[in-house]
Curated annotation (Swiss-Prot):
Changing residue 328 to D: No effect on glycosylation. Mainly expressed in ileum and kidney, lower expression in cecum. Its main location: membrane. The lineage of its organism: Eukaryota, Metazoa, Chordata, Craniata, Vertebrata. Glycans are attached at residue 10. This is Ileal sodium/bile acid cotransporter.
Amino acid sequence: MNDPNSCVDNATVCSGASCVVPESNFNNILSVVLSTVLTILLALVMFSMGCNVEIKKFLGHIKRPWGICVGFLCQFGIMPLTGFILSVAFDILPLQAVVVLIIGCCPGGTASNILAYWVDGDMDLSVSMTTCSTLLALGMMPLCLLIYTKMWVDSGSIVIPYDNIGTSLVSLVVPVSIGMFVNHKWPQKAKIILKIGSIAGAILIVLIAVVGGILYQSAWIIAPKLWIIGTIFPVAGYSLGFLLARIAGLPWYRCRTVAFETGMQNTQLCSTIVQLSFTPEELNVVFTFPLIYSIFQLAFAAIFLGFYVAYKKCHGKNKAEIPESKENGTEPESSFYKANGGFQPDEK
């Protein structure tokens, strides 16, 4: 019979009944392997998304950046303010409030480009918004955090990982640029790549959520208030982004694009900032909130996508669509949707 007071076999230091067991590095190894694989897959998916971006229209958004400006206001105006209001309203701990605000100040995530495709959004606007928000985050993140977190913490204690932001920018711009080139040179082949990549992108989004749940199982042990904020925050981002875009006079398909670009945050960047800025003891309180936000932003995105697909099947073909005026050097097109091919059968 085993002595209950004896040390376990793999203990490295024993003193009576006190033992030090080496920590398992399985999660660390799994995290590195999966991060590498997911990064490669994400680059391939973004390459396929680039195959739906037209150079002329993309440059049109850069030259006449009304849509990008609306997205900028949503990304670095609405989201940080919403995070601040939620933190004050729920009276959460200062550390928790800071993490909620970090989420709100992050640029848009690349998953928004995949979802914009599936809801027949404006891919040219989606890619240009993600690129610009990531680039502008170099200056806007420190500014927003300085404004909103000073009532809880010294803003100088929050570390902005500029190298990670730069890496995110490169991993977005390079594959998308190659995809744009393929679409320009070989449009028929680009359509095939796009079909495959869009399906792979949907699978990748689910895979990221599952992997996050495996690696950070402690995420389910978190303050109830953070669960509620993690539920409300992405919905508020999607809704307010859509509303502001509509008030600004953007057509419906661009409103959907802005909505996803607003609510879909770069939670990986947020996790990196949190890890660099807080002690291990503080991380126990706050580290899992980015994962909670990520889960709910994907869950509600899937729900909104389902509603859109159902609406499109019931009303899309019968809707009296108002042509959009010529803009950005493009021909007039429907203001309701601009079919990307997502959930749409090929014509016989």
